[in-house]
Amino acid sequence: SNPSSANVIAASPWANGFYGSPGVSGMLPAAYTLLGRRFLSSVQKAGLENQITLKEWRKGTVNTPDGWTYHAKGIWVTLKDEAGPSVSLIGSSNYTKRSYSLDLEANALIVTRDVGLMRRLKEEEEWLQEYATKVDQGTFEKTERRVGFHVRIAMWIVTLVGGAL
């Protein structure tokens, strides 16, 4: 048995910066919904649902008073009996061909034994968790989470052209 566990936090559709935007970009929150659903299916097929949890982050609704977008990216690793993460990967972790070709991407790997820094990293992780809610396949079956045919076709096209984007 593997005692390790992982929480994956993604933006809820209502915390996605493209929520409600006109045109093709407005399809992105639904596309991420479909990807989340597929991710959970893969977790279940691998028999890892007791070790890997998918959560969605939401603090209000974007473009409304007090609505926040979610764009946090990172990995926080806390070893057993530690005050907080001793390993953290932070940065602009976009790993697509487009990102490698056109964007400047940077990451930093932090490895620490400093208890104060570990506690601060833990506080950051806890703040993210505070606004994150566990999702399951039932979440994606709700009417407001249905992904339209046009989004599915667009994702299929993106898969075909792949790295050209």
Could you tell me what each predicted segment is?
Residues 1-165:
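PLD/PLD-like phosphodiesterase catalytic module centered on the HKD motif
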